[in-house]
């Protein structure tokens, strides 16, 4: 059953940020004591893909893609932020992902003892659960938050084209060789050139796109986004604390797999949580262009069905 929430009174007063003066990094407050930073990602063109000898076949061909400006959260969503949504008693808990609901409780600790304080990144959620959090943010703030597209994520990771060598990556992220078998607090490592933390390593990050091995060959050149299909595979990016440093590339694409939820004993398996996906989290983006309420709601309906 759909749950209808009242819209914030300032919703109709929201204006579109269009000028250089307005397009700046800001702090999004979601509670008197909780906020997160949204970093400006400028419009531009870049080469999507990789010509590295370590690249997989789905990282080719190199293509020039043009993107509109957007904001991206400077770090992965943390438990401090997620728990405001998860504990929002105005929302019903439901096994189905419909309307606006909050995630059902985990039947076991899906951090597997790695840590759950406010600065740890939230982990083990499905892509749809991450999108529901984005919808909750929209209802709470009036701003259109969503998961990044693959192209947006890769563009932000490359940050103007300055690639980090595997040897230098230990200063920027946690991976198999330096993570001690667990994920860590956000922002413990250096940010990339655009001020984004943990883009490579710590947790893999959901994008909004359906995984297509031919993505780089088939997507359009401007602001590409794929239409959702089956639950599997969807695309994650960035690598995690479990991945070797050689897998931490901005162009590396990670298709989700039913094995990420293999040990879930529930019938049917949870649509919110991934018992074996302890390595995946997410961060949010906000397009500069604020669409109408009707278009935004249709967007959420499409990607949450």
What are these regions (language model features)?
Residues 171-200, 228-230:
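Short, well-ordered junction/capping motifs at the entry into regular secondary structure
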Residues 48-54, 66-168, 209-216, 286-305:
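Active-site microenvironments of metalloenzymes and redox enzymes
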Residues 54-65, 180-182, 203-305:
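Surface-exposed recognition segments
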Residues 39-40, 123-124, 146-148, 164, ...:
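Structural recognition of the beta-strand scaffold that forms the well-ordered cores
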Residues 34-47:
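Mature N-terminal segment immediately following signal peptide/propeptide cleavage
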Residues 1-5:
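Positively charged n-region of N-terminal signal peptides that target proteins for export
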